[in-house]
Amino acid sequence: MVDGEDKIKLIIIVGPTASGKTELAVRLAERFDGEIVNADSMQVYRGMDIGTAKPSPQLRQRVPHHLVDIVTPDVNFSAADFRREAAAAIDDIHSRGKSVFVVGGTGLYIRALLQGLVDSPSGDESIRRELVELAQTVGNEELLRRLALVDPETAERLHPNDRLRIIRALEVYRQTGRPISTFRSEHGFADTYYDCLKIGLRVERQELYRRVESRVEVMIEQGLIAEVEGLLRAGYTPDLKSMRSIGYKEICAYLAGECTLDEAVQLIKRDTRHYAKRQMTWFNKDFEINWVEYPESFATICNHVIEFFA
């Protein structure tokens, strides 16, 4: 067991593509003497810069970024690989007395880091809302006492102030009739070594889609076609997992004469919009995320971080 006071504190910044995560992370890391751990499944690949919207060299000079450019495009980098590499990077950053910011839109990677790789029961919003109201009425101590009656193992690990996890444990029991500790023991999950503040960037849908379309056009202007041509010349074939990602597969099709450039660009825009929608569906299921508007709420976000570190 790791006591709450001994856990490494992580600031986790999530949101859909083109929502401004990287810029926010850099500003916060500069403000709070931190370093960034990338949680984007495509930015790990060397030579795939434009199509992955990788942080610019200028941003990476301002703040150290980890798990960027760590493997070649022919490596099948997995969530398990990410979990291992991210944990090592977090330990390194923490050991040097720096704040840790985990930033990205790959929800599976973030879940792998925090919870392991086996699904726990999905959340039930109505049960969660009822338990939140109960906590406000009876208080955390009583809520923890009630958890101890049905799941003493989990209750023993939790502090009364850890309201979110108490509610989550009660929610799982109400849903399944089983203590959450039985899911943990079945899958061999260890107690997480992290204490997390999750910040999500919310962007109005039409504005997000406008940003997506603008970003795709900028990628073409910056040389996405030449980037893909270079990857193909280097021997990275279109059937690789990395080359089948959004932006690369469409340009590969264009270069193979399977569609026009305009058709490829329209497909990239469409597929990126769909991806952003899937990202929001994923993150909306996480009740621990504090959703904010950015950049309007930067001061509010800073206050959240200050309170978290206090």
UniProtKB/Swiss-Prot annotation:
Q: Which residues bind ATP?
A: G15, P16, T17, A18, S19, G20, K21, T22
| Subunit structure comment from the entry | Monomer.
**Protein residues bound to substrate:** T17, A18, S19, G20, K21, T22
Q: What is this protein called?
A: tRNA dimethylallyltransferase 2
Region of interest: Interaction with substrate tRNA? 40-43
Task: Give the family per the record.
Answer: Belongs to the IPP transferase family.
Catalyses which reaction? adenosine(37) in tRNA + dimethylallyl diphosphate = N(6)-dimethylallyladenosine(37) in tRNA + diphosphate
Give the species: Geotalea uraniireducens (strain Rf4) (Geobacter uraniireducens)
